[in-house]
Amino acid sequence: MANRIQMGSIWMDCSIQSPCFRFEPEEHFPFDSPANIEIRDSTSSPSDIIWVVVNNKLIAARPVMHTVSFADLQELNLVHGYEVSIDGQWYQIRMLMDLDEWLLALEAVGEDDHIWHWEQCQSFLQQPSGNGLRVLCTDSRRLDQPDMVMRTDRRQQTGWRPVLELARKPDFQKLEVGQKLLCWGWQSLVNGILLENGTYDLVLQRQDGTDISPKDTATFASPAMDDQVIVNKSAVAGLRRKSNGIKSRG
């Protein structure tokens, strides 16, 4: 079962958008300048982005915008990406690197369309195509093969599926005993109340929404007595105070 987190919002020209939105307005011409796209803090609304916890990063559960070209995304610096602050934590936001990253994510949590919403839609890849006019994207029919589209084409079935990776270590010193926390790493998610903030570990009172993969117990988080969880600080790929409005969606 995939662990999911709903946090962060996407805005176009200062208006919040709901994934998956149309980047090119109906009245735009194909080569109009792209709109301004921003990733901002969570709004605690259904418009916040849903992410899948997989391979020590977050990958959007669906493309967040469609009818956008690879050239648009380059101009917006959304291919290789940049650092962005979401709810006080800094991440690197970028496009999927290559087909291997996509296939490894599917292998880790399953190919279920209810998780990834990959049927009938494609996601751009950074992976070079070997053709200056065309770029690669995932294929909505054959998962193990990339498809190729024109660099400047805006197509409804092709979109931007962002990836979030931790850019700066969480400031554990700011955490306070008694706080409700949500932290994740590899394929696992821990939801709980902070009991101890040690030198190397966090000890949390487990709450609903916690799901620890057996493969992650030796590296990220392990169950303890009295329904507690010990989290290895060095393996945390993201951590948030629940007061920020972040929702876990197991």
Label each residue range with its predicted role.
Residues 1-14, 19, 64-66, 84-191, ...:
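C-terminal, surface-exposed recognition/capping segments
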Residues 54-56, 185-187, 207-210:
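Glycine-centered tight beta-turn/hairpin loop motif at sheet-sheet or coil-to-beta transitions
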Residues 55-91:
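Extracellular-facing segments of soluble proteins and assemblies that are Gly/Ser/Thr-biased and enriched
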Residues 191-217:
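Basic/aromatic-rich interaction segments and small domains that mediate binding to polyanionic partners
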Residues 210-250:
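Intrinsically disordered, low-complexity, charged/polar segments
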